[in-house]
Regions:
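Extended, charged catalytic domains and RNA/DNA-binding interfaces, predominantly
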Residues: 1-309
Length: 309
């Protein structure tokens, strides 16, 4: 990734070469934070973890072919399901005490996760060349508005101890609106692991974590992205608990999210023809679907121009 950002050529999974027209000045690799490092661990046929067999040798050269794309895509769909499916009383207790639902799974290895995060940090530092190519340690907080009543609050205890697993994917009525953020670290102070959706789906809990880090000398910002696929919930006028937002909420959010992404390959998030009917450019690269789904994403509350107004 860093070689590509600096102007080098890399091979696409389908076999062709890719290269930027111009090298970048700064860069952050923002891998999904939750279960970071787990897939390479599961892909190792000698990992000794029952249930990981479908992932064995996943990234071996013989499997990185066009014919295996569908199979590998299906494996991605079972990514979180693996965490949900394998647990025992000890792992569920650890999950409850730590507040990290990933630790409720016998397949989750906290040392693997932290080692992968350490690799992210070291890679960014190794490629950092101030004045020429600046890198930032970063990750993606991949939450969604698919809140699950059995993984939040007091009901989480019952979920963890009933032995049937928790619904980490969430359920209606929130319908899986994208609420992803890229979390960027400043300077050379970092955490031992990222704050992920497996600790909380609530972005306000992420901000509280960031506030606490700042008090201890670790500065971060979060950058919301793909709000166009949030089903109108990235900039809604209510907080996570459904209460009207006020100035305290605005200050809380602005302190931790002073920036927002307006456009990327999955569509623009600046405005929408429904929101800006007199703007002839409002239909530029619109993606009306929620991220990773064909379901319609409501425009109101999902676009930056309206949020600023």
């Amino acid at each position: 990734a860093y070689d590509f950002a600096k102007g080098g050529s890399i091979k696409h999974a389908l076999g062709y070469d890719m290269k930027l027209r111009e090298p970048l000045d700064f860069y952050a690799v923002t891998d999904h934070g939750f279960l970071l490092g787990s897939i390479p661990d599961w892909a190792d046929p000698n990992n000794g973890k029952a249930g990981t067999e479908p992932f064995h040798n996943l990234n071996s050269p013989e499997n990185l072919i066009q014919e295996s794309v569908a199979e590998r895509s299906n494996l991605f769909q079972s990514y979180v399901r693996n965490v949900n499916s394998f647990s025992n009383i000890w792992t569920r207790l650890v999950a409850y005490v730590t507040g990290d639902t990933a630790r409720g799974s016998t397949l989750y290895d906290v040392d693997v996760h932290r080692t992968a995060w350490k690799d992210v940090i070291q890679s960014a530092q190794r490629h950092n060349d101030p004045g020429n190519f600046t890198t930032f340690v970063a990750y993606e907080y991949t939450t969604s508005s698919a809140r699950s009543s059995n993984t939040e609050g007091s009901s989480a205890l019952k979920c963890l101890f009933n032995g049937t697993g928790c619904n980490f994917a969430g359920s209606p009525p929130h319908e899986n609106g994208n609420l992803h953020r890229n979390v960027i670290y400043k300077g050379n102070k970092f955490t031992v692991e990222p704050f992920t959706r497996l600790k909380s789906l609530n972005p306000e809990d992420l901000w509280s974590w960031m506030d606490e880090l700042r008090e201890n000398g670790v500065d971060t910002i979060a950058i919301p992205h793909n709000s166009n696929g949030s089903n109108g919930q990235m900039f809604e006028m209510e907080n996570w608990d459904g209460l009207p937002i006020a100035s305290q909420y605005a200050e809380f959010r602005m302190r931790n999210e002073p920036l927002v992404e307006m456009t990327q390959v999955k569509g623009t998030s600046e405005t929408h023809p429904i929101l800006s009917p007199n703007d002839e450019w409002a239909d530029f690269e619109i993606m009306d679907q929620r991220v990773g789904a064909s379901t319609y994403s409501r425009p109101f509350g999902g676009y930056v121009r309206q949020a600023y107004l």
